[in-house]
């Protein structure tokens, strides 16, 4: 019978953590900071001690500036190591890895960031949404390093995972970033992205590489993007529509350009309008 109060206390602590996270989501950082102090103290000692809650609240406190700047990296690493021991492969473990990888990237430590991202995988049990968020960041890092072929591969992997997870805004972002790279060089004899992913093998390290894109992949991406982007054609800077027009020209598929031309009165980007006139 003595276990019942402990269970009630744990539930209360869970609710307190949820309240803190809700405040953060609503932008009420100051109130969240106050609650986080109580959650931290209660989770790390006494009858309510809970390693998982402690790791979560320490992760959030590191991200909202409650840890000295010089200690943030160490705190994030502590969270990763603790979660690796008690909840390996969970969404929270993946989230901690994502934040540690981002911390390294923001400091210009790109190889450390890539190494941290490599710990996130479906084989380790991480859910596909976390894996996809990792892959899009890896793609961006490799793109910044001029390593275009693997950047395209990781962006495509992220895109596929986002679509599977019904994460539409993220899928659109990954699709556009992949398309921007893919349009640089096109060859109908190039392998498709699915074949490239199937035959991909680890490399010793990044390099500078590029491979032409298969036009069928480009067409698939445009067909996915087109109805989503056409929900609203307004906006003074529509780089996304520019990519659609470029794909229409390079693949010799005027249907996309003609569809935009039929709705040009809705388009505000002068560069897109000029392209439609050409």
Where are these regions (language model features)?
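Amphipathic alpha-helical segments of tetratricopeptide repeats
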Residues: 37-44, 77-85, 118-124, 156-166, ...
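N-terminal leader/linker segments that initiate helical-solenoid repeat arrays
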Residues: 1-27
């Amino acid at each position: 019978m003595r276990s019942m109060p402990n269970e009630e206390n744990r539930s209360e602590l869970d609710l307190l953590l949820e309240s803190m996270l809700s405040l953060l989501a609503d932008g009420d950082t100051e109130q969240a900071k106050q609650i986080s102090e109580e959650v931290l103290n209660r989770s790390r000692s006494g009858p309510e001690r809970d390693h998982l809650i402690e790791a979560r609240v320490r992760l959030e406190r590191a991200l909202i500036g409650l840890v000295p700047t010089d200690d943030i990296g160490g705190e994030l690493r502590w969270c990763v190591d603790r979660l690796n021991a008690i909840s390996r492969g969970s969404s929270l473990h993946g989230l901690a890895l994502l934040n540690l990888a981002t911390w390294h990237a923001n400091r210009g430590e790109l190889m450390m960031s890539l190494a941290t991202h490599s710990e996130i995988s479906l084989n380790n049990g991480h859910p596909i949404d976390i894996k996809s968020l990792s892959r899009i960041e890896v793609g961006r890092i490799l793109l910044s390093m001029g390593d275009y072929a693997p950047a395209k591969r990781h962006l495509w992997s992220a895109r596929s995972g986002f679509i599977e997870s019904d994460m539409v805004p993220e899928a659109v972002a990954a699709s556009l970033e992949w398309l921007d790279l893919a349009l640089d060089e096109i060859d109908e004899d190039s392998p498709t992205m699915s074949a490239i992913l199937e035959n991909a093998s680890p490399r010793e390290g990044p390099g500078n590489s590029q491979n032409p894109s298969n036009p069928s992949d480009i067409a698939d991406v445009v067909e996915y993007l087109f109805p989503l982007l056409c929900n609203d054609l307004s906006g003074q800077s529509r780089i996304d529509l520019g990519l659609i027009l470029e794909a229409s020209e390079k693949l010799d598929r005027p249907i996309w350009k003609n569809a935009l031309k039929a709705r040009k009165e809705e388009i505000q980007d002068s560069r897109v309008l000029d392209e439609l006139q050409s």
